[in-house]
């Protein structure tokens, strides 16, 4: 695992500000992109999972070698939380649904609203790092978002896995 994390560490985007900087000009870059060599579009859920893996390695004896990367990833994720408490994949507060009615928006992906599955991974990361709803505004707001978006049947929708099983297991984990 350490070899893989050592491969991931230098791929953290620390000096390129993508589109997200428009809404969060005071937030420093600190995420990882799901695509190789795409520093303009780091994403929040992959960043959360990389941070969790680095934290697990740290607890398993890797020492402080990942501390700076973890701290910067957490800083970026917290800075990217949307007003409603959730997190989106790549952006923040990008919720102008009318944009999906533009004729060339045939797949309805011109916006990047907060989603349950991405929010769940960010919440999981914060909890794994020892934050609680009592001492972390970001975690408290994220949990509130998940409570608000749970459906009457108990499930959550997963945008990126495109089904309710995906969204529900992501939230429960």
Where are the language model's segments positioned?
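Preference for long, amphipathic alpha-helical scaffolds in soluble/luminal domains
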Residues: 1-173
């Amino acid at each position: 695992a350490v070899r893989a994390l050592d491969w991931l560490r230098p791929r953290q985007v620390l000096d390129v500000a993508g589109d997200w900087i428009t809404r969060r000009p005071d937030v420093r870059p600190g995420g990882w992109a799901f695509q190789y060599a795409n520093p303009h579009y780091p994403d929040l859920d992959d960043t959360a999972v990389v941070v969790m893996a680095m934290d697990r390695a740290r607890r398993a004896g890797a020492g402080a070698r990942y501390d700076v990367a973890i701290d910067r990833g957490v800083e970026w994720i917290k800075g990217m939380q949307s007003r409603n408490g959730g997190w989106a994949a790549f952006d923040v507060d990008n919720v102008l649904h009318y944009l999906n009615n533009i004729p060339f928006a045939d797949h309805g992906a011109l916006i990047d609203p907060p989603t349950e599955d991405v929010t769940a991974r960010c919440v999981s990361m914060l909890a794994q790092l020892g934050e609680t709803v009592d001492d972390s505004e970001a975690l408290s707001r994220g949990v509130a978002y998940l409570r608000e978006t749970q459906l009457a049947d108990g499930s959550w929708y997963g945008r990126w896995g495109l089904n309710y099983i995906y969204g529900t297991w992501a939230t429960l984990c």
